[in-house]
Amino acid sequence: MWSLLLVPTLMVVYDFFKFPIDTLYFQNPMRPLCGIRNTFRDLIHFNSECSVKNYPGLMLIKFHFHKIKVEFEAVHPTLKKRYYHDVSPWFEKNENYYFYKIKDFPMLSSLVKQIPCIDTQVAAFAVSEGPMILHPHRAESNRLLRYHITIHGGGECTLYTESGSHQHAEGEEFIFDHSRYHELIKTGEGKRVVLILDVNR
């Protein structure tokens, strides 16, 4: 009987010890089951490349970049800021790091609904004002990949991931596995705005 538990136990251990270790891992009783699924997906996607070109629907976002930027500039001043520290215990209180949900941007919301690979649950414009560090972290599940396209760069700003680094420059897009290590270091004084979309693998 114990031998039957060995494989799922090893799968959970593998997921738990990914860097950075999530100190909240076992506070959620369902997290070990998520860990087993994560390890299974890691085996399936071993050595697979995270690339925007693998998701043709995302070309619509790039193609309409100017319209998306114009709509953001027109609409966001009318909206209330939503703070990341209010929705996740991982984030320290920081009133310079906030977001706007894309459901409040009619043109973009309509566009995203035309792209089947996008999961809209966390779709948002993420805004960071001034210098900032988001320390190494990772998502609970690897079911989704994370897509970024930069609306405003806001000065020197680099996202570091297991597969390399990405500069947040206006109009640049990037996709990565956010269940793996990533951190953000922003030394620029300006406002960085990034459209964040989750993509089904």
Model regions: which residues?
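Non-heme Fe(II)/2-oxoglutarate
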Residues: 2-115
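Short, surface-exposed charged micro-motifs
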Residues: 124, 148, 183
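Conserved metal-binding segment of the jelly-roll/cupin
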Residues: 167-181
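A short beta-strand-loop-beta hairpin characteristic of the jelly-roll/cupin
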Residues: 151-170
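A short hydrophobic beta-strand segment most commonly corresponding to one strand
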Residues: 146-150, 175, 190-201
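Short beta-strand His + acidic residue motifs that chelate non-heme Fe in jelly-roll/DSBH
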Residues: 134-137, 158-160, 176, 182-188
